[in-house]
Amino acid sequence: GMASTAGSVLGKLAKTAIGIL
């Protein structure tokens, strides 16, 4: 649902940020 979708998006953003840093 909404929670899992939000978690997935946050996970992708976190991985992207880590990749950039």
Curated annotation (Swiss-Prot):
It comes from the Eukaryota. Its main location: secreted. The keyword Transcription does not apply. One of its GO terms (cellular component) is extracellular region. Keywords: Amidation, Amphibian defense peptide, Antimicrobial, Secreted. Expressed by the skin glands. GO terms for biological process: defense response. It is found in: Secreted. The keyword Transcription regulation does not apply. The modification Leucine amide is found at L21. Antimicrobial peptide. Belongs to the gastrin/cholecystokinin family. Magainin subfamily. This is Peptide PGLa-R6. It comes from Xenopus ruwenzoriensis (Uganda clawed frog).
